[in-house]
């Protein structure tokens, strides 16, 4: 155990010193990684996050699933293909290093973190994720939007792009109504694109709950022009 890590946990004989942080990595350290998978709405980010968790869990690894501002409004990772999984909601006050240490204190392994909606993290959260990777050998896989409805980098996404070991654009292509690749997440209120308002306004690609608010993926040209096209059957699909 590195001396600074043992000291941080209260010495080599503390309860935490006996808990494997990431399998046998504490005895045989291996590099961990911070990876950011990004793409527009509807490209399958949350589905990929749950698949990643499944792949690691089936190999005997133990992880935590986290989210921030899921479309469900709860502490869940949900997908448009009907999959869902309980998750830990990342609040402004939550220290992610402290969260992992709490699990170690209870004798629970934490080999990896799955973080959905990571674009909405605070920069401080991302710094904590980097610390978990570098100092404690915990793998971190983040999934989220890169830009907001103004087509500006989200704070968490910006910091992830600055710190991540790998930045991966999800290859499922989402199309604008014109058929070109869509990369811009337009916020639509009352049938019109809006470019004003809070950065975070939880809604889906189909207006629900009596609120006339939704998001639509557009190509750059139609995003700039504010052109939504004619309503089509495709707008009613709920594929993630």
Residue ranges and their predicted role:
Residues 34-36, 62-64, 111-114, 139-141:
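Residue-level preference for the first positions of well-ordered beta-strands
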Residues 2-8:
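Extreme N-terminal basic, low-complexity initiation segments
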Residues 26-103, 148-159, 201-202, 209-239:
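Conserved P-loop
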Residues 8-29:
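Short, Lys/Arg-enriched N-terminal segments with co-localized hydrophobic residues
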Residues 108-121:
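Conserved P-loop NTPase "ATPase switch" module shared by AAA+ and STAND
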Residues 49, 116, 164:
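Residue-level signature of catalytic and energy-coupling elements of molecular machines
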Residues 31, 107-109, 135-137:
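Short loop/turn elements that form and flank the Walker-type P-loop nucleotide-binding site
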């Amino acid at each position: 155990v590195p001396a600074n890590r043992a000291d941080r946990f209260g010495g080599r004989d503390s309860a935490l010193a006996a808990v494997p942080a990431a399998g046998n990595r504490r005895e045989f350290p291996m590099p961990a990684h911070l990876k950011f998978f990004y793409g527009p709405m509807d490209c399958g980010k949350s589905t990929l996050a749950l698949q990643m968790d499944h792949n690691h869990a089936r190999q005997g690894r133990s992880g935590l699933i986290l989210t921030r501002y899921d479309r469900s409004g709860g502490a869940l990772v949900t997908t448009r293909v009907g999959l869902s999984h309980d998750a830990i909601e990342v609040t402004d006050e939550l220290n992610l290093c402290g969260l992992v240490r709490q699990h170690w204190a209870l004798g629970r392994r934490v080999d990896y973190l799955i973080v959905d909606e990571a674009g909405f993290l605070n920069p401080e959260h991302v710094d904590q994720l980097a610390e978990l990777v570098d100092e404690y050998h915990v793998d971190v896989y983040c999934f989220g939007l890169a830009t907001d409805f103004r087509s500006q980098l989200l704070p968490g996404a910006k910091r992830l792009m600055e710190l991540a070991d790998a930045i991966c654009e999800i290859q499922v292509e989402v199309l604008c109504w014109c058929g070109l690749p869509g990369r811009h997440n337009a916020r639509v209120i009352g049938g019109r694109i809006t470019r004003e308002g809070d950065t975070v306004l939880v809604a889906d690609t189909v207006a629900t709950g009596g609120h006339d608010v939704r998001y639509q993926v557009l190509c750059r040209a139609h995003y700039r022009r504010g052109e939504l096209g004619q309503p089509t059957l495709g707008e009613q699909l709920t594929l993630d």
